[in-house]
């Protein structure tokens, strides 16, 4: 699929990995819709760093836990920027949820943002993709789906569901739309998790380091440029999955 001047929606593009993905898509010639929920300042910083700035790219706010907000987000994006050809489901939340103290609210929050939202985003954009005969969806999953972290079970469960959703969407949307997932290991940890100990994840990997945003961006670019890969989960975890 030719990427030049096509529209890409990147969720959670105001910070960290989403910001880096948006920057790379713009470098590939795409027009980027930068979604954010709370990170308005980061979203503005993202668009200011893209070629063409706000004259070429779009910033939109939405709470992806609400399906009505998803429909409004996609509708506004396509009205202002044009048909969405690429969807990057990057927005997610991640925090400790010890088994015996996890609340219903925490469970519902993580499953809604990390699994429900990617489903309804894909549902909303994919019909147009199929009718136009092309489209690409990339879901950010996680290396923990195979070996869940016991203190993050709702998060790991949501990402395991997203793996299944990725493969199911690839089947449902073929042959016009390619759907793949990227499973990062420990990559670009959030500042508010500075006190968390990620040394075990590093030790139980082959490359013995935390990944960078660039490591994931390269995987995104590969999946966008390839027209013969679908239904695949690409591990980018420093070899943790085979340690």
Give the location of each predicted region.
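Conserved glycine-rich Rossmann-like NAD(P)H-binding loop of the short-chain dehydrogenase/reductase
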Residues: 28-45
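Conserved Rossmann-fold SDR core element
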Residues: 25, 163, 173-187, 229-236
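Alpha-helical segment proximal to the catalytic Tyr-Lys
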Residues: 127, 170-175
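Substrate-binding pocket helix/loop in short-chain dehydrogenase/reductase
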Residues: 98-99, 106-111, 137, 201
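Active-site helix of classical SDR
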Residues: 122, 158, 166
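C-terminal substrate-recognition "lid" of short-chain dehydrogenase/reductases
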Residues: 212-236, 241
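Conserved glycine-rich cofactor-binding loop
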Residues: 7, 14-15
